[in-house]
Design a protein with these regions (language model features):
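Conserved kinase catalytic-core helix
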Residues: 38-43, 59-138, 143, 227-234
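Active-site acidic catalytic loop and adjacent metal/ATP-binding pocket
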Residues: 123-169
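ATP-binding glycine-rich loop module of kinase domains
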Residues: 1-36, 53, 57, 65-66
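Conserved HxN/HPN-centered segment at the entrance to the catalytic loop
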Residues: 37-53
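A glycine-centered beta->alpha junction motif in the catalytic cores
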Residues: 23, 51-71, 104-108, 161-162, ...
Length: 264
């Protein structure tokens, strides 16, 4: 649970964990408030929220390398469908806010002219009014999966509450799953997989981007999910610039390029 790039620190108790960060402009406490307001089996139970963080139930962490990623992906979607996506969107979206946010990131980090042109072309190709709008978790990656002791129920930790720039649109969550399918956890943390013993029904336990595509309602939502995946990866660059080796930053730029190949 001490993974991540936010700078948060953790204090462990017998049945709970305290998460705190004094340098994130209140992001951690807002996360705790969101969890408390949206309590369900899909997310951690929050016991208290304070100025710089919150205290939540203690959960079991199973190493990424031992997870059957196909089974976990299906479990993430099931929990989101039942407890998160089934709720109404709460944050009004501003396309201009999204455009401005992406422009700021492109101004700070050089990802190449081809990626910038792809972003513009893909944004224009999407029918944004046709996309499913609902409450979103904001960060349902494989890395944010834990399990409830005693029941082994899948729990998705560390939500990122929606904003006008990163809104309550289901494609935002699908884009995060695609980020994992591209290998985010392997690139960021150097994780490897031991999937041979975990293979089921003769198929690999590892996921690829097209497993995520099966959860999109149509090509339009898939296009939006790929776009949001690229935006999510761009959003990691400021954090990685502070706490990750240059190779990790270069590899994430490579992931951005890979993601742009999923659409014609």
């Amino acid at each position: 649970m001490t993974r991540g790039s936010s700078g948060a620190t953790f204090r462990y108790y017998l049945e709970s964990v305290g998460k705190m960060c004094r340098t994130d402009d209140g992001r951690t406490s807002r996360q705790g408030l969101w969890l408390r307001q949206h309590q369900s089996p899909a997310v951690p139970k929050v016991l208290s929220v304070y100025e710089h963080g919150y205290q939540m139930e203690r959960l079991d962490d199973i190493s990424y390398m031992w997870l059957n990623h196909r089974v976990v992906l299906a479990g993430i979607v099931e929990q989101l469908e039942q407890h998160v996506w089934s709720q109404s969107a709460e944050v009004e979206w501003s396309q201009q806010a999204t455009v401005d946010k992406v422009a700021d990131l492109l101004g700070m980090f050089d990802v190449g002219v081809e990626v910038q042109l792809w972003l513009e072309k893909t944004h224009e190709s999407i029918d944004w009014n046709a996309l499913p709008r609902c409450l979103t978790h904001g960060d349902p990656t494989l890395d944010n999966v834990m399990f409830r002791p005693g029941t082994s129920e899948l729990v998705i930790i560390d939500p990122v509450p929606a904003t006008s720039a990163v809104p309550d649109i289901r494609a935002v969550d699908l884009g995060k799953m695609l980020q994992s399918a591209l290998g985010w956890e392997r690139v960021r943390y150097g994780y490897r997989e031991v999937t041979g013993a975990l293979d089921t029904l003769g198929g690999s336990a590892r996921i690829n981007p097209y497993h995520v595509q099966t959860y999109a309602q149509d090509d339009n939502e898939w296009n939006a999910a790929v776009l949001w995946c690229v935006i999510h990866l761009l959003r990691t660059l400021p954090y990685l610039a502070r706490c990750a080796a240059p190779k990790v930053q270069d590899d994430v730029r490579g992931m951005i390029g890979d993601a742009t190949t999923f659409l014609p």
